[in-house]
């Protein structure tokens, strides 16, 4: 059994501390603007540990921070303190579950808002000496 950390041992890589620091919409907005290099007018909603499960037999996800802005765009902000080999597929799955939750039956695909998945790591996940990796879903031709 892992020993529980004391409050003074917590860092931003711990879920509790991460949420306590990032639950402030102004602070969260500035962090997202800096990382994504975008302008966000106002954040509307910040919730911690949001669980999404789209079907009875589907894999559930727990979003560390689920954030929306005044345009309806969605930001999923995650903190990851252990090495994971399947990061690109995990991000793909998270984004797909978020997208499924956005549309109601019969809604047009144009109603899908922008969504971003941001992971904070305490290590370089791809070992390329970078502090930011950007992935886009796009056609190459």
Question: Can you describe what each PLM-predicted range is?
Answer:
Residues 1-141:
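Elongated, amphipathic alpha-helical interaction scaffolds
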């Amino acid at each position: 059994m892992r020993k529980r950390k004391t409050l003074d041992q917590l860092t931003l890589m711990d879920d509790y501390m991460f949420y306590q620091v990032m639950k402030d919409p102004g602070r969260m907005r500035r962090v997202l603007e800096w990382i994504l290099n975008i302008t966000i007018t106002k954040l509307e909603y910040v919730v911690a540990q949001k669980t999404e499960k789209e079907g009875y037999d589907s894999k559930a996800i727990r979003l560390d921070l689920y954030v929306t802005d005044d345009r309806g765009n969605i930001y999923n902000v995650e903190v990851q303190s252990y090495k994971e080999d399947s990061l690109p597929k995990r991000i793909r799955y998270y984004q797909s579950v978020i997208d499924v939750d956005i549309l109601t039956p019969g809604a047009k695909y144009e109603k899908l808002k922008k969504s971003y998945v941001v992971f904070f790591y305490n290590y370089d996940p791809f070992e390329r000496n970078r502090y930011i990796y950007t992935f886009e879903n796009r056609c190459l031709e």
